[in-house]
Amino acid sequence: MAANVPPSAEALTSGGAAHKTAEDIANQYDLLPKLIPYLDRHLVFPLLEFSSGQDDDSEIVRAKYELLKHTNMTDYVANLWQEINNSDTIPDEFVKKREEVLAKLQHYQNESEKITELLQDEAVVGNLRSDKVANLRFLEEQHGVTIEMVNSLYDYGRFQYSCGSYGNAAELLYQFRVLSTDNDKVASATWGKLASEILTTNWEAAMEEVQKAKDSIETRLFNNPVGQLHNRSWLIHWSLFPFFNHDPARDVLTDLFFSPAYINTIQTSCPWILRYLAAAVITNRNRAHKNSSVYQKQLKDLIRVVRQEGYEYSDPITDFVKALYVDFDFEEAQKKLGEAEEVLRGDFFLVSAADAFVEAARHLISESYCKIHQRIDIKDLSTRLGLNQDEGEKWIVNLIRDTRVDAKIDYKEGTVIMNHPPQSVYQQVIEKTKGAFFRTQVLRFVAS
């Protein structure tokens, strides 16, 4: 009801905690101001709560109040007002609004009672088909259902959502969508149900709604390219919630973001999304298809887009990709990896992926470094990976074992000898010249 509180940041992230290390880096690359315009106010709340572990708590409390004061979460908003004003009393305006909210809830419940009971009757539901017009005719003729009753489900669902009752909202909007032929309201209900599933952390259902929203954008807005661009931008941002919280969503959404329509949207409207796409691709290295052509294609596509969009957007995550695969600068890649870790730990969506990113990035640095050098100094490579010599030695042993490269470790000399196939000329090229002319060829080799 009105006392509901939006889900916490902890509930919507995969167990990662906010850290206050290197605040200057994290704050410099904070994307919250860019994300907020593309999110519903209820979806913004967990991001603000996450920031409360990093920023001035009093400012965050005030921001929460400004965010939610126009919703029907009256009890929670009243509590925020008390906290801001250091008061034990609740102003009359909140008491009055609470009474109004309760009265409206009762009104909507009464209006929709008949149709909600019918839709819970298995005998009635068993007679429904995929044809909405036929379903409405059946319900009208057999049970006296009217269009107004169907629309009451929509109004009631929206009101429950405004009260923070996201589970109830999802069910009501689903019931409305089953029966309604009003395309605009059905599209609105789909967005409402998507937000509700996100806020109840029902990721499988959320992904179903992502697909429905995508289909709606393609069909309903077919002749409206500007509308498609705006709606795709919203869908991209909303999809970040399941992207890093639901493993099966990772491949689906990575493919979606790389698809022509959506990568064009990212480049045109929201290039900062490259941070999340880069994090997804890099961490995909640790997943099942890390050696497959799918991963290699993702990496090549990422490198291409990062190179193209460098003038428009960059942060330590995209700069890491650029340093390693465009500039082939291992020292810069090491520097950017350290900064990237701090940015990841300060990002609501990526905090739980920070360790996986660092692990995968070290592997990518190692693999790239080993591919272009014949003799590798263990101490030097360890430094590039941000490890001490003992840790670096263990790392390299594991790398050789896991990737099955042909290499020998000379513990006495502290080196690794790479037995590259004689037909590979790229090592010779990179060791004899650092010219930019050859970097495209090296890139192809590293990403292959």
UniProtKB/Swiss-Prot annotation:
The keyword Magnesium is assigned to this record: no
Location (main, coarse): cytoplasm
PROSITE patterns: PCI
Annotated ranges, domain PCI: 254-423
InterPro entries, A to Z: eIF3e, eIF3e_N, PCI_dom, WH_DNA-bd_sf
GO cellular component, one term: eukaryotic 48S preinitiation complex
Disulfide links within the chain: none
GO BP: formation of cytoplasmic translation initiation complex; translational initiation
Intracellular or extracellular location(s): Cytoplasm
GO molecular function, one term: translation initiation factor activity
Keywords: Cytoplasm, Initiation factor, Protein biosynthesis
Pfam families the record matches: eIF3_N, EIF3E_C, PCI
Similarity field: Belongs to the eIF-3 subunit E family.
Protein task: Component of the eukaryotic translation initiation factor 3 (eIF-3) complex, which is involved in protein synthesis of a specialized repertoire of mRNAs and, together with other initiation factors, stimulates binding of mRNA and methionyl-tRNAi to the 40S ribosome. The eIF-3 complex specifically targets and initiates translation of a subset of mRNAs involved in cell proliferation.
Quaternary state and interactors: Component of the eukaryotic translation initiation factor 3 (eIF-3) complex.
Official protein name in the record: Eukaryotic translation initiation factor 3 subunit E
Chain's gene name: int6
